[in-house]
Design a protein with these regions (language model features):
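Conserved binding/recognition cores within well-folded domains
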Residues: 135-172
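A generic structural motif
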Residues: 37-46, 98-100
Length: 172
């Protein structure tokens, strides 16, 4: 199942994917996103997915997300169906996608070691609280702001600027 909701706020809109086979969890996360966006004046667009395959199809269509709130274990998970670890590997490997913050939302802590190569941004242990969602998104927004810092300089009487994270080295 796929659904999209947008919440208007003060910052650049971020796109969030919720991928969980538990409808109650999807609804809780959606409500937390709405509450957070209103309370903190953030602009969030989100989509819900019941399976990893549905989310992967979105990427195959050329769509992407800034944040993925991703379960690891899915009911009726046969050998042909992806779990959250496999989806993370595909996104990081096939698409060389390091920009998406993959956040595992799970009851299964034993997968933490398996996910190291995927470089998850965070783990949120179920049951989830609104406070934990706020903590995650505030950290995420701070990290994004740090990446957008600009270095300004003048060369040959022309003012220039460059995003600090794009600077490899300085020469004098």
């Amino acid at each position: 199942m796929f659904g999209i909701m947008a919440y208007k706020g003060g910052d650049r809109m971020i796109r969030v994917a919720i991928c969980d086979d538990d409808k109650h969890m999807q609804e809780s996360l959606s409500k937390y996103l709405l509450d957070y966006s209103i309370q903190c004046d953030r602009e969030i667009d989100h989509a819900e997915f019941d399976t990893c395959e549905e989310l992967m199809d979105e990427y195959l269509k050329g769509n992407s997300f800034d944040v993925i709130l991703l379960d690891i274990e899915f009911k009726n998970n046969d050998e042909k169906q992806m779990n959250g670890i496999e989806l993370g590997k595909r996104l990081r490997g096939l698409y060389a996608n390091d920009n998406t913050a993959i956040v595992y939302v799970t009851s299964y802590g034993e997968y933490a070691i398996d996910s190291i190569k995927i470089r998850p941004y965070d783990y949120i242990k179920k049951p989830i609280t609104y406070e934990r969602i706020v903590e995650f998104f505030e950290t995420y927004y701070l990290d994004q702001a740090k990446r957008k810092k600009v270095f300004e300089y003048t060369a040959h009487k022309v003012k220039n600027s460059i995003i600090v994270s794009n600077i490899c080295y300085f020469e004098s």
